[in-house]
Amino acid sequence: MQKHFTLAVDADGIALITMDSPGRSMNVLGPEVEAELAAIVDRIVADAGIRGAIITSGKPSFLAGYDLTEFLRSFGPQLTPVQVYENFKGLGNLLRRIETCGKPFAAAINGLALGGGFEVCLACHYRVIADDPKAFVGLPEVKVGLLPGGGGTQRMPRLIGVTQSLPYLLEGGNIAAAEAKKLGLVHEVVPAGELIAAAKRWLMGSPVAVQPWDQKGYRVPGGVAFASAGTTQTFMGATALVARKTLHNYP
């Protein structure tokens, strides 16, 4: 029985996955949510009648990230590093499963998608966001001294390059819909009422169910020369900028 998601498949073979955790104002990630979503992904992959899927939310926001209560339960001084790794590798494995499963997934981002929520979007092959001030994306974990652990630090630079990614990875700022489109983090910005239709339009076209970085000949935008003088200067400059903005109170 599904508690956090509903799954509906229309006559065209498009699956609509709607997140709507009961008793919460926002959807958040946790082991139970991840297990449910993993089971849904497996079902979609196994069903030859399903040609693609849309992930969206039944709440005003999309997905707010990881449940900190679950996080604290899974991480503590009583656990070994290996145990901590085992507790947190599930999300990364799930998102890699989505992007390599062979069927196209589109994210219909109706509200904020932060942290793990944005990482879910980045794992989808297509991203549509609502033209709404309350719809924005980002990886804010660094603000509380954490690291985005679901692959966001890897997918963002692979989409828009190291130089453009660094300010968002180091400062954890929110990215509005129009800016996300300009950067290349989302594909479309549409009115809120057209989100699902836009995602389905892509799925009904000729969707590519392979991420750019999994395609032959892929190159990181701007180059991947982390040891180059230019990249080193970028890292140094970004670090100095963050230190100045935070009055050296960077977590």
Predicted features and spans:
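Hydrophobic, secondary-structure "cap" segments at the distal end of domains
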Residues: 153-163
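Glycine-rich beta-to-alpha active-site loop
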Residues: 96-144, 148
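Glycine- (often His-adjacent) and acidic-residue-rich active-site loop
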Residues: 57-94, 113, 143-145
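Receiver (REC) domain switch/active-site residues of two-component response regulators
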Residues: 125, 186-187
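Intrinsically disordered, low-complexity segments enriched in small/flexible residues
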Residues: 31-34, 40-41, 164-166, 170, ...
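Conserved CoA-thioester-binding segment of acyl-CoA-metabolizing enzymes
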Residues: 1-56, 82, 93-96
